[in-house]
């Protein structure tokens, strides 16, 4: 096995809740950097000039951070739960979780906030795990609609929650920096599962807390 083959790894084999992904062979870092140089030249610049000479390396390192969610495992994040909750049986909610993602159509960033609530059935998960769950799905190429469903699916499936509510409010740079060039337009997506879908009073409680 040569060095290039050894450097390649398979990605996409973790929990990909809400996605139909087959494991793919990840190119080497050198191959990824070469692809960035090609795009720089296609844009009309010289990838060998002083200001761009290190850009391919920086872009590849940025991709590692922006798309780290492909290596995250939602099931693992939600696997450790606590049952000693002193009989707590009401809504658990996290408000204003940062969302930093990229759309799958133009790879343009979309930035916003997420609100998550669930109704536990005897066990709860650490609050930081829910924020981490959002980060795992956000750091993948996808649509906001898909991400909203992925988060709801994961909480419903792995926590056996009686109900789940997810709302994401984000601004898409594919709308503001290209195409129609509309600024200050936000997209809101929601998912309600279980009692949050059937109990309109509970659903309204969630929405009121979002607005608070």
UniProtKB/Swiss-Prot annotation:
Q: Which GO terms describe its cellular component?
A: cytoplasm
Q: Subunit arrangement?
A: Toroid-shaped homodecamer, composed of two pentamers of five dimers.
Q: Write down the InterPro entries for this protein, in alphabetical order.
A: GTP-CH-I_C/QueF, GTP-CH-I_N, GTP_CycHdrlase_I, GTP_CycHdrlase_I_CS, GTP_CycHdrlase_I_dom
What family does this chain come from, according to its entry?
A: Belongs to the GTP cyclohydrolase I family.
Q: What is this protein called?
A: GTP cyclohydrolase 1
What is any one GO biological process for this UniProt entry?
Answer: one-carbon metabolic process
Pathway info? Cofactor biosynthesis; 7,8-dihydroneopterin triphosphate biosynthesis; 7,8-dihydroneopterin triphosphate from GTP: step 1/1
Q: List the EC numbers from the record.
A: 3.5.4.16
Q: Does the keyword Hydrolase apply?
A: yes
Annotated catalysed reactions: GTP + H2O = 7,8-dihydroneopterin 3'-triphosphate + formate + H(+)
NCBIfam families assigned to the protein according to its UniProt record, in alphabetical order: folE, PRK09347.1-2, PRK09347.1-3
Its keywords, alphabetically, are: GTP-binding, Hydrolase, Metal-binding, Nucleotide-binding, One-carbon metabolism, Zinc
Q: Source species, please?
A: Caulobacter vibrioides (strain ATCC 19089 / CIP 103742 / CB 15)
Q: In Gene Ontology terms, what is one molecular function of this protein?
A: GTP cyclohydrolase I activity
Q: Which PANTHER family match?
A: GTP CYCLOHYDROLASE 1 (PTHR11109:SF7), GTP CYCLOHYDROLASE I (PTHR11109)
From which residue to which does any coiled coil extend? Answer: none
Residues bound to Zn(2+) are 103, 106, 174
């Amino acid at each position: 096995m040569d060095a290039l083959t050894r450097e390649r790894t398979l990605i996409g084999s973790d929990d990909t809740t809400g996605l139909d992904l087959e494991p793919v062979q990840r190119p080497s870092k050198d191959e990824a950097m070469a692809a960035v140089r090609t795009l720089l030249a296609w844009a009309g610049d010289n990838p060998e000039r002083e200001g761009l000479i290190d850009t391919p390396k920086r872009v590849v390192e940025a991709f590692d951070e922006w798309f780290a969610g492909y290596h995250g495992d939602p099931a693992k994040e939600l696997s450790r739960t606590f049952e000693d909750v002193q009989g707590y049986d009401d809504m658990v909610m996290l408000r204003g979780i940062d969302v930093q993602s990229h759309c799958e159509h133009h790879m343009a960033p979309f930035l916003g906030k997420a609100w998550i609530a669930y109704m536990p059935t005897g066990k709860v998960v650490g609050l930081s795990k829910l924020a981490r769950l959002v980060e795992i799905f956000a750091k993948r190429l996808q649509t906001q609609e898909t991400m909203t469903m992925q988060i709801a699916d994961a909480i419903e499936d792995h926590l056996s929650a009686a109900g789940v509510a997810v709302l994401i409010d984000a601004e898409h740079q594919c709308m503001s920096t290209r195409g129609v060039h509309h600024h200050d337009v936000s997209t809101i997506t929601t998912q309600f599962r279980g009692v949050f879908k059937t109990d309109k009073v509970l659903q309204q409680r969630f929405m009121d807390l979002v607005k608070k």
